Amino acid sequence: MSVPNSSAKALTVESSTRALEGQTAEWYLVTRAVSYTVNGGALAVGALVRLITDYPATSVSRDSAVWGPWQGPLDPVEWMITVTRVAPHEYAYKFEGRDKHDPIAPFVTVLSGVHTAGLNELGREMEGFGAGSFTLDWDARATLPAPDRNVGKANYTYDHMGPGQVVTIKAQFRQVKDDDRPDKLVDADYAFVQNPGSVGSMDFIYNVPADAVSAGGVGKVRSRWQWSGAGRSDVTVNATDLPVTYTVSECWNEHYASTFKTVPLSSDPKDNYGSEETCAFATPEYSTL
């Protein structure tokens, strides 16, 4: 996403192409990319917890188990994972690390969360289902040896209690790097809902601070789709130095081809085409995140 200077019109989420009528819809591509990336983060954390807890714990007490500390020959950090049962079917966990060459250094928590397991009809826990929250702290990780380029924090909540249940994922990213502008730190909010066999939605808000060449602004995207794949995105953009709200709406069919697009502030026919009556959702709906 980028914020143009005062001579430009809008804050935009960038995609690789500018869709034309009949081509793959630009805002479908944005919706898919954002949802796959953010949802993938939640799935990756869940998979990591399950992977580690599949191994025998190093130590076990009545309500907690500890894996580690363990070291790898090429990893300068030694890691420890603690899982604590806080209530029936409810667990808290934390991933901690420290410099493996400093055995008296305190452990630093880089990932922590809580999880309530989904239960089947017999009251037994189902792997891969549940509700909870977690925080991934890249700033904390940066205090340990060999940090990566990530900074800031990600706070997730999720709910998928069983097969056939609604999936909800929310995320807040605070002071993370913008891939397009590595020197910028930005905030973003995200919400995803998928009803089983039915409609789904994604909301994404991106806040960009001002700098020497940009006044900054806020972009909001709300996308909705049918189970067939046909959908619609409605976008609003407010740049700090512009007195107007910039809007974009685009619809796509079940083949993800763009069928309708409107950009009220543009007179370019490439930005305005098709009939809104063909949309899976006939009226715009803007994000309220």
Language-model-detected regions and their locations in the chain:
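N-terminal "mature head" segments of proteins
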Residues: M1-H89, T259-L289
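Acidic, low-complexity intrinsically disordered regions
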Residues: Q23, D63, D75, F134, ...
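A residue-identity detector for tryptophan
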Residues: W27, W67-W70, W79, W138, ...
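Short N-terminal edge-element motif at the start of the domain
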Residues: A47-A146
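Polar low-complexity intrinsically disordered regions enriched in Ser/Thr and small residues
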Residues: Q71, D75, T116, G200-D203, ...
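Acidic surface patches and DE-rich sequence motifs
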Residues: Q71-G72, V86, D99-D102, K177-D178, ...
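Short helix-loop boundary/capping segments
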Residues: V108-Q226
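Hydrophilic extracytoplasmic domains
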Residues: S223-L289
